[in-house]
Amino acid sequence: TDYWSSCSQYNTVLFRQFKDENIKINEEMANCLLTGLITDTGRFQYSNTTSEVFSIAAELLGNGANLSKISENIYGSIEFNALTLQSKIIERIVLNEDLQFAHSIVFQNDYKDYQVEPEETDFLIDVVRLVKESTVALLIKEQEDGSFKGSLRSRGDIDVQKIASIFGGGGHVAASGFSSNQSPEFILEKIEY
């Protein structure tokens, strides 16, 4: 069966494959798959949230997935240092009103200054996405090797997967990412022009 041409969500593909191969989904697997569905769909808010996603989520809950625990682990609490770094990232948000495009950046020295691990900042794209006047949000994160990773989110009909593909990245219509050895200024120029 060709799942990939009709499905952009890895966790949906895994779920279908488990079902097709009669693999019993235990509680641990259900928690992992539901975590993926929640994050892939932005808590069931992005345009890739379909009736099938809700059906799968319901079945995973029936198999023992713990929605409360998953939500608390992902969204319910933030380390104090990561929260103080969030305020710095908010200060750096730039809004291009003409393009309805908001962006911000996290530098390597931010991780050191705030004593935060890079993975503790994954939620920051959702902070940039909160800018009401934007339909596209970008968070650029400097990597240890000096390269940059970009996380893109969109509202409405903007396909951020097309933007990510400029840099060899990909993802979904509403949530995509990329890596680049170019400077943040170059990245922004390519996106804005």
Which residues are covered by each model-predicted region?
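Hydrophobic helix-and-loop "lid/oligomerization" segment in the mid-to-C-terminal part
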Residues: G42-I166, G171-E192
